[in-house]
Amino acid sequence: MASKTYQAGVKEYRQTYWQPDYVPLDTDILACFKITPQAGVDREEAAAAVAAESSTGTWTTVWTDLLTDMDYYKGRAYRIEDVPGDDACFYAFIAYPIDLFEEGSVVNVFTSLVGNVFGFKAIRALRLEDVRFPIAYVKTCGGPPSGIQVERDKMNKYGRPLLGCTIKPKLGLSAKNYGRAVYECLRGSLDFTKDDENINSQPFMRWRDRFEFVQEATLKAEAETGERKGHYLNVTAPTPEEMYKRAEFAKEIGAPIIMHDYLAGGLCANAGLANWCRNNGMLLHVHRAMHAVLDRNPHHGIHFRVLTKILRLSGGDHLHTGTVVGKLEGDRASTLGWIDLLRESFVPEDRSRGIFFDQDWGSMPGAFAVASGGIHVWHMPALVAIFGDDSVLQFGGGTLGHPWGNAAGAHANRVALEACVQARNEGRQIEKEGREILTAAAQHSPELKIAMETWKEIKFEFDTVDKLDIAHK
C-alpha cells in the first residue's frame, strides 16, 4: 500500500470493481442481482457500480482509500448473464469478502446488499435474486430456535404435515369469543391455531386477555383429544421491550409457541426473539407480512428466496411460503425452490427453480414451510404432494367457513389430510387421483362431504406476476 498515490477525481467504476477473471473464494458471500441500467450505461459499468456502492465505493476517489487494502475489501462484479426473454436487464454476479460483514448479523448483510445502492441513479431498477452464504458465515448465525425434529418431538406429531387454522375474522373479536373459536378448531382435530398477523393488542382485544383465553382453550382441547395442541400467540409489539414482555407471559402460562412478523417487526427484533426462544424452550412461528412489497416486482426489490434464507439465518421454526394453489402469489417451481432452502441441509444450484448458487447449511436445523392463503379441502392432495410432511397446512376460511361450524371444518381438514397421506404412502398419485381419494374418505365423514360440496367451485386462477425468468423464454 505504501507505493500507492492519491489521484483526485472521478473514474469509471469498472476500472476497480469489474473483474471478469475473478474466481470466488469459498468464504465469499455471493450475490446475483438483476440490473436494469439507465439508457447509455453499459452492462460492465452498471455491474461494477452495484459492486462498488454495495461495498467500499463512493462516487469519487477519496484519499482515505490509501489507509486500507481496498483490493481485499471491495466487492467484485465477476460475471454477467442475459436474462431469458428480457433484453432490458441482465444478471450481475458479485463476490463480497466475508470480512465486510459482522458475524451473525443479517441486518448488516442487508444494509450493504440492499442499502443505498437500490436508489442509485445510474440504475433504473435493481433486484437481489439470490445470495450464497458460505458455511463460514452460516455457522455464525443462530438459525431456527428448535428446528423440525425437535418440534415434532415436543408436539409428538410424526409422519404427516401439521394442520393449522388462522382465526377469523382477523380483527374485531373479543378475547373470550376468540378463545372459543380456538377451542372449537383444536377440539376438531387441528394441531395449531394462529393469531392473524394483524392481531397485536388492539382496543377490542388486549394481548394479555387473548393469551389467557387462548391458553385455557388449548389446554381444554388437549385434555379432550389426548393430543398436544398449540396456538401461535403473536408477540409482535411496538418495541422490543414490549415484545419480550409478551413472550415471557406466554411462557409463564405454558404456551408452547409464539409468533412474530419478521419483516414488519424487523430482522434485529426477530433474531433477538429467536435467541430468546432457543434459551427458553419455545417454538417460533414466523409470518412474512410485508414481503410482497419487497419481492413481487420482478425487476426491483428482493426475491423471496433471499428473504427465506435470511429468515433461516435469523431464526424461526415456521415460515409462511405461499401455497401455489391458493389465493397468494407463487409459482410451483420457485416455491419448491425456497421450500428446500428453508428445510434441507444442502441445496444445489438449479436455475429451473430459480436457485443461482449452491447453498450449504451445515448442521443448521431446517424450519417448517407453512402453506396458507385461500386453501380448502379440495387443495389437500396438491398441498400434500407439493409440501410433503415437513410443513404446516394452515387453513383459515377453509376451516371456519364450514357450514356446520369450526369443529366440523377442522374435522373435515383432518380427515382429508389423513386420507391423502395414506394414499401417498400406498404409492398412489394423489394429485391425479385426488377427487377419488377425497370422495372415498367423505363416505365416512359427513363433515368432509359438506366441505367438498361447499368449496367445489372455488378456484384462484390468476396468472403469477413474478414468474421464473426461464418461463419467459
Curated annotation (Swiss-Prot):
Binding-site list for substrate: N116, T166, K170, R288, H320, S372
Pfam families: RuBisCO_large, RuBisCO_large_N
Keyword Cell membrane in annotation: no
Annotated keywords: Calvin cycle, Carbon dioxide fixation, Lyase, Magnesium, Metal-binding, Monooxygenase, Oxidoreductase
Signal peptide: none
Coiled coil: none
Cofactor note (record): Binds 1 Mg(2+) ion per subunit.
Residue numbers bearing the N6-carboxylysine modification: K194
Active site positions, chain numbering: K168, H287
Binding site for Mg(2+): K194, D196, E197
Enzyme Commission number, as recorded: 4.1.1.39
Reaction(s) catalysed by this chain's protein: 2 (2R)-3-phosphoglycerate + 2 H(+) = D-ribulose 1,5-bisphosphate + CO2 + H2O; D-ribulose 1,5-bisphosphate + O2 = 2-phosphoglycolate + (2R)-3-phosphoglycerate + 2 H(+)
Cofactor(s) needed: Mg(2+)
A GO molecular-function descriptor: ribulose-bisphosphate carboxylase activity
Free-text function comment from the UniProt entry: RuBisCO catalyzes two reactions: the carboxylation of D-ribulose 1,5-bisphosphate, the primary event in carbon dioxide fixation, as well as the oxidative fragmentation of the pentose substrate. Both reactions occur simultaneously and in competition at the same active site.
More info: The basic functional RuBisCO is composed of a large chain homodimer in a 'head-to-tail' conformation. In form I RuBisCO this homodimer is arranged in a barrel-like tetramer with the small subunits forming a tetrameric 'cap' on each end of the 'barrel'.
Name of the protein: Ribulose bisphosphate carboxylase large chain
Phylogenetic placement of the source organism: Bacteria, Pseudomonadati, Pseudomonadota, Betaproteobacteria, Nitrosomonadales
Gene symbol of the encoding locus: cbbL
